[in-house]
């Protein structure tokens, strides 16, 4: 079955229009993409609005787009930006749904087998299903993803074939529909009505699809669908009545009965062949282990159509040849999609490195009888397989790597900032007396209420420097990999808010740090060639001072290395162009003042508000959440809502403590809605 995608135009909704270098960059990028160029490079200086440029590019070319980021945090930031810029289009977030993941592994030296252990984030899993649902049902889709998009995923054709399309007036037997939902990996549960489950009450079936927050109610009269509703799963309130709805499977690895029967046959055949090899080599223990594990999985697949670790048999389910690339998220896109790789100097090498790390672990499992050789084909794409599947790519970076620069026919530059801000001036100073000089520079800027970043080469030096500055009366903190993520967010917010003035770090002051209050970046030991002092790293670090009108960078070095020369020459080139543009157009650089948003503060405020509200009603935590289902129209009373609010508040704070920020933010939003509902009920006098 070929997907039928609804067509709606991509549209950017913004109070701002393209400015600075953006109009030229957008026009040139769109021209090259429309001309069919396979690779285009955007060299965009820090703070020039590359994300907005990408959004306007998508609006120009009208293509479904995959945006790749090199970590979950940046992906979440990008997804938020694109949702604000394109509110009428489907902006999806596709990352690994594991909060914790320990893959199965075997250590031959100690004869230790490590079972697969993982903790799945249900909200991120919903967003993954929402992504594939959107890709197969509409064209106006922007997916923000990490390298998770190149890992194996179920075959889109089988996913589509398993989908059930329901329509009012449609003839279908109730039991047939129930069996269909079970085959789609949904579970019947008449008590716990949650995502991935369905429940049956007489001729009414209710299901919460894996990709939805709202439930679907199917009311039947005999073998005919009489009505379809979308409803709130908690309160049972009907959101809207529908004429038709499509329900997609509850797993990306779903397969039809005939496909599964064929797959089991080829798995058994491979098992016999592999057992023969192992026994011939005298590996009797490995042969027995493989026989037991595989036969158990086969029995599970025969009984329920699924087993733990079914992805290791994906080659058989898909009917692929040995060594053939797996299906992944890229296969769910239409043929004419566009890929935008953000911070390409980091993301491109990351994509290329995924395959080897995965295969080395699995080879050990295969050799020792824990998995069949076909498990090796459940893997991420190799770099050449990735490029074969991508029709056109736009690489975005302030410092494009050699690979990107060698691919495109010249780069598209975006150097001029909409704010008129110019790249910081660079001053090279000798290392002798560098600490005293830096201390003097810090005091000058503290008097102006400006902030300072100091980057060192080692953790020890960062700590010692922090202690020295603190003894000298400077308000200072340090930041390195041992500082946990939540504390890192707090430190950056405190720096911007003026709780302290100087932040000392190592390699954490590069991509993705947006600190407009910083006017000085000090780079100690700038002449020590290496990863932390390469031209790319230096340019990225210099960019941290590019969001302030009086931004400066002080490099402490006794020798001018090649990396320093390249970084200084590139920065001077950009400054010259920016100053000339500002002079020609009469632009005065405008200070960039961004609102300081700290998720920890927002969540703490929400939690305090909830506590006061419940105490005000004499509540607090009550008995376990009662069963909210009602015959007819379900509704939650005030007391029940209090309990739910209390539970949700605990879940929100727990999610924040476990660094599940996306989940915490969503719980915060849901909490706000429920509290508004409770206040309205109190105002109206509807108390239970």
Curated annotation (Swiss-Prot):
Keywords: ATP-binding, Cytoplasm, DNA damage, DNA excision, DNA repair, Excision nuclease, Helicase, Hydrolase, Nucleotide-binding, SOS response. GO terms for cellular component: cytoplasm; excinuclease repair complex. CDD domains: DEXHc_UvrB (cd17916), SF2_C_UvrB (cd18790). It holds the Pfam family UvrB_inter. Residues 607-632 are annotated as: Disordered. Coiled coil: none annotated. One of its GO terms (biological process) is nucleotide-excision repair. A motif (Beta-hairpin) lies at residues 97-120. Residues 31-188 form the Helicase ATP-binding domain. Its main location: cytoplasm. Forms a heterotetramer with UvrA during the search for lesions. Interacts with UvrC in an incision complex. PANTHER family: UVRABC SYSTEM PROTEIN B (PTHR24029:SF0). This is UvrABC system protein B. The lineage of its organism: Bacteria, Bacillati, Actinomycetota, Actinomycetes, Micrococcales.
């Amino acid at each position: 079955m070929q997907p039928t995608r609804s067509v709606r135009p991509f549209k950017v909704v913004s109070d701002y229009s393209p400015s600075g270098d953006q109009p030229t960059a957008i026009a040139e990028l769109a021209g090259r993409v429309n001309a069919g160029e396979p690779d285009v490079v955007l060299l965009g200086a820090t703070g020039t609005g590359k994300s907005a440029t990408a959004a306007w590019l998508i609006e120009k070319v009208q293509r479904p787009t995959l945006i790749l980021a090199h970590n979950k945090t940046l992906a979440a930031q990008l997804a938020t930006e694109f949702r604000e810029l394109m509110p009428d289009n489907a902006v999806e977030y596709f990352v690994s749904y594991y909060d914790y993941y320990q893959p199965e592994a075997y250590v031959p030296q100690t004869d230790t087998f490590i079972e697969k252990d993982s903790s799945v984030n249900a909200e991120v899993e919903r967003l993954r299903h929402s992504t594939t649902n959107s890709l197969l049902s509409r064209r106006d889709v922007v997916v923000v993803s990490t390298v998770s998009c190149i890992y194996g995923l179920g075959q889109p054709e089988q996913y589509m074939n398993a989908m059930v399309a329901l329509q009012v007036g449609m003839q279908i037997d109730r039991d047939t529909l129930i069996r269909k939902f079970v085959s789609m990996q949904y579970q019947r549960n008449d008590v716990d009505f949650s995502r991935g489950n369905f429940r049956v009450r007489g001729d009414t079936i209710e299901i919460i699809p894996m990709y939805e927050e709202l439930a679907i109610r199917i009311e039947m009269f005999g073998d005919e669908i009489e009505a379809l509703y979308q409803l709130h799963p908690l309160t049972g309130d009907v959101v809207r009545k529908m004429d038709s709805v499509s329900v997609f499977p509850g797993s990306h690895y779903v397969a039809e009965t005939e496909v599964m029967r064929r797959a089991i046959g080829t798995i058994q055949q491979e098992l016999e062949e592999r057992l023969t090899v192992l026994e011939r080599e005298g590996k009797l223990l490995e042969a027995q282990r493989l026989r037991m594990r595989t036969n158990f999985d086969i029995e599970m697949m025969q009984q329920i159509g699924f087993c733990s670790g079914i992805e290791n048999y994906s080659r058989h389910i898909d009917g692929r040849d040995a060594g053939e690339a797996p299906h992944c998220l890229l296969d769910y896109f239409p043929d004419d999609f566009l890929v935008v790789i953000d911070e390409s100097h980091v993301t491109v090498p990351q994509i290329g490195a995924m395959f080897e790390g995965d295969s080395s672990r699995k080879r050990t499992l295969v050799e020792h009888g824990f998995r069949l050789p076909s498990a090796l084909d459940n893997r991420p794409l190799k770099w050449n397989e990735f490029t074969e599947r991508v029709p056109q790519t736009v690489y975005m970076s302030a410092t494009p790597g050699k690979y990107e620069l060698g691919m495109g026919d010249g780069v598209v530059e975006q150097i001029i900032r909409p704010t008129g801000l110019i790249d910081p001036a660079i001053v090279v100073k000798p290392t002798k007396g560098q600490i005293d000089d830096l201390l003097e520079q810090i005091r000058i800027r503290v008097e102006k209420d400006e902030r300072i970043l100091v980057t060192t080469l080692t953790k020890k030096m960062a700590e010692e420097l922090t202690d020295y500055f603190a003894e000298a009366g400077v308000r200072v903190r340090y930041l390195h990999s041992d500082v946990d993520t939540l504390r890192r967010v707090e430190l950056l917010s405190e720096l911007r808010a003026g709780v302290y003035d100087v932040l000392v770090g190592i390699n954490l002051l590069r991509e993705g740090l947006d600190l407009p209050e910083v006017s000085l970046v000090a780079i100690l030991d700038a002449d020590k060639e290496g990863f932390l002092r390469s031209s790319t790293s230096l340019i990225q670090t210099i960019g941290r001072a590019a969001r302030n009108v009086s931004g400066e960078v002080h490099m402490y070095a006794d020798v001018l290395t090649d990396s320093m020369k390249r970084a200084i020459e590139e920065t001077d080139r950009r400054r010259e162009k920016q100053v000339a543009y500002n002079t020609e157009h009469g632009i005065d650089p405008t200070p960039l003042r961004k609102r300081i948003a700290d998720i920890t503060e927002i969540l703490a405020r929400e939690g305090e508000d909830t506590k006061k509200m419940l105490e005000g009603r004499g509540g607090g935590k009550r008995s376990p959440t009662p069963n909210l289902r009602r015959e007819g129209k379900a509704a939650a009373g005030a007391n029940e809502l209090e309990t739910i609010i209390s539970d949700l508040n605990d879940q929100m704070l727990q999610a924040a403590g476990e660094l599940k920020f996306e989940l915490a933010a969503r719980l915060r939003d849901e909490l706000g809605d429920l509290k508004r509902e409770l206040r309205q009920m109190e105002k109206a006098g509807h108390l239970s």
